[in-house]
Design a protein with these regions (language model features):
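Short alpha-helical segment within the catalytic ATP-binding CA
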Residues: 15
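Beta1/beta-strand and adjacent pyrophosphate-binding region of the FAD-binding site
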Residues: 1-12
């Protein structure tokens, strides 16, 4: 029998699930989209990756004032996109593996309460 049902596999849900499981609870997580959190994986990681790339270009251009020869730097959008996808996939896979290693049962779908003690998917 599941003692804890967590609806949503974002950062808060993942923390709650692993904490409860480590304390010995039987935990079920219901996620309709992606483990790791849609906003986290679709907004934060891509934007932070693009910001980091922009900063690297800025630093590369600034080294000319340090007596170093510079080359014109540009963004390879395909490579940047591949890196973003790799980071997202790695984070999602690592989070899923962590949940499974803690014995958290994962269910794909949308969960909702039908009464204070019942969740349907």
């Amino acid at each position: 029998m599941t003692r804890f049902v967590i609806i949503g596999g974002g950062p808060a849900g993942n923390t709650a699930a692993t904490t409860a499981a480590r304390l010995g609870a039987q935990v079920t997580m219901i996620e309709r989209e992606v483990i790791g959190g849609a906003a986290h994986l679709w907004d934060c990681i891509p934007s932070k990756s693009m910001i980091a790339t922009g900063r690297a270009i800025s630093r590369t251009r600034a080294i000319g004032g340090m007596g170093l020869e510079t080359v014109d730097t540009s963004v390879d959008v395909e490579t940047l996109t591949q890196r973003i996808e790799w980071v997202k996939d790695t984070m999602r896979d690592n989070t899923t593996s962590l949940l499974q290693s803690q014995g958290v049962r994962l269910i794909r779908g949308s969960g909702r309460f039908t009464d204070p003690n019942t969740v349907v998917v």
